[in-house]
């Protein structure tokens, strides 16, 4: 059985956009670079040709990876979720119990996780510690950087 990948609708759209760009913009551009480099003659010592072939290999690998993830996507419409328990798709406001600093994280699938955008993977130590907890609860997260304690201030569905 094929393992489904949980993904938000926006995460699915972002991966679809990347796939379309790689197929319709990057692929033709790389093929053009290969043809141009090939026209320069001897391929054995043609650095431009080898660089273009390497770029092609990288691009095709990413296309295959994106096609696989999109085919296995289990799209979850976060706007239809509710409740005060943390689960996939929840946006959670945390307060660091040591520093009192607030942090807001949305729990998403691995393919769409991006800490800079406030999105953490459901498989991350923080998300695993939060799943099933409610607002007002305290959690301890054991991560590579050491243990941290947080209070769950709010659970939202955006």
Curated annotation (Swiss-Prot):
Q: Output the InterPro entries linked to this UniProt entry.
A: GreA/GreB_C_sf (IPR036953), TF_GreA/GreB_CS (IPR018151), Tscrpt_elong_fac_GreA (IPR006359), Tscrpt_elong_fac_GreA/B (IPR028624), Tscrpt_elong_fac_GreA/B_C (IPR001437), Tscrpt_elong_fac_GreA/B_fam (IPR023459), Tscrpt_elong_fac_GreA/B_N (IPR022691), Tscrpt_elong_fac_GreA/B_N_sf (IPR036805)
* Gene3D superfamilies xref list: Transcription elongation factor, GreA/GreB, C-terminal domain, Transcription elongation factor, GreA/GreB, N-terminal domain
Per UniProt, the keywords (alphabetical) are: Coiled coil, DNA-binding, Transcription, Transcription regulation
Going by the entry's taxonomy, the superkingdom of the source organism is recorded as Bacteria
Segments traversing the membrane: none
One of the record's GO molecular function terms: RNA polymerase binding
* Pfam families hit by this protein: GreA_GreB (PF01272), GreA_GreB_N (PF03449)
Coiled-coil spans in chain: 47-74
Which GO terms are recorded in the biological process aspect for this UniProt protein?
DNA-templated transcription elongation; regulation of DNA-templated transcription elongation
Q: What does this protein do?
A: Necessary for efficient RNA polymerase transcription elongation past template-encoded arresting sites. The arresting sites in DNA have the property of trapping a certain fraction of elongating RNA polymerases that pass through, resulting in locked ternary complexes. Cleavage of the nascent transcript by cleavage factors such as GreA or GreB allows the resumption of elongation from the new 3'terminus. GreA releases sequences of 2 to 3 nucleotides.
The record ties this protein, via PANTHER family, to:
TRANSCRIPTION ELONGATION FACTOR GREA
Homology family: Belongs to the GreA/GreB family.
> What's this protein's name?
Transcription elongation factor GreA
């Amino acid at each position: 059985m094929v393992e489904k990948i949980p993904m938000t609708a926006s995460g699915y759209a972002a991966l679809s956009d990347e796939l379309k760009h790689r197929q319709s913009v990057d692929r033709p551009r790389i093929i053009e670079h290969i043809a141009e480099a090939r026209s320069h003659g001897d391929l054995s010592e043609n650095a431009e040709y080898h660089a273009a072939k390497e770029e092609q290999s990288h691009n095709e690998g990413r296309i295959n990876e994106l096609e696989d993830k999109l085919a296995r996507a289990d799209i979850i419409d976060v706007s239809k979720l509710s409740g005060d328990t943390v689960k996939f798709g929840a946006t959670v406001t945390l307060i660091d119990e040591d520093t009192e600093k607030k942090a807001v994280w949305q729990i998403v699938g691995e393919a769409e996780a991006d800490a800079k955008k406030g999105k953490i993977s459901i498989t991350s130590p923080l998300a695993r510690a939060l799943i099933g907890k409610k607002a007002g609860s305290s959690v301890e997260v054991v991560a590579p950087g050491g243990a941290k304690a947080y209070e769950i201030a709010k659970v939202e569905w955006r």
